[in-house]
Amino acid sequence: MKDLTAKEEEIMRYFWDNGPLFVRQLVQMHPEPKPHFNTLSTYVRALEEKGFLSHESFGTTYRYFSLVGETDYKNQTLRQVVKKYFDNSYLSVVSSLIKEEALSVEEVRKLLDEVGESDTKKS
């Protein structure tokens, strides 16, 4: 899966949240100042080339839809971060979060409970 720029991720969120869209709908959904139609159209075509979107024809216009789900994208991005910055160790990720106080003791307990429940269901 290819990486997305921040703007491409922002555009994908519109598709993940709303389903299939025409570019003109995408323009309307953006807050002021609204981007130009051609600008969004260029981003949408780039997302299609990267394999994140596809389209169906409606006369002379296209309606675009997501090929990659938000959860799949998040999971893949997380795997890439863990591999690149934490030597592919999720333990290192959790340890770093605890050291930076971004993860509380209570949250660690909840994680351990979830892991325990998951192990119980697998048995």
Predicted region positions:
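Short, cationic-aromatic polyanion-contact patches
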Residues: 4-7, 58-77
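Pre-recognition alpha-helix immediately N-terminal to the DNA-recognition helix
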Residues: 9-14, 92
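Short, locally clustered residues in the helix-turn-helix/winged-helix DNA-binding domain
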Residues: 13-19, 98
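Short acidic, hydrophobic short linear motifs in intrinsically disordered regions
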Residues: 21-29
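Short, hydrophobic-biased segments on the C-terminal half of alpha helices
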Residues: 41-45
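Glycine-centered, phosphate/nucleic-acid-interacting loop/turn motifs that mediate DNA/RNA or nucleotide
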Residues: 51
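Short beta-strand "wing" residues that participate in macromolecule-binding interfaces
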Residues: 55
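Amphipathic alpha-helical dimerization/coiled-coil segments
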Residues: 76-120
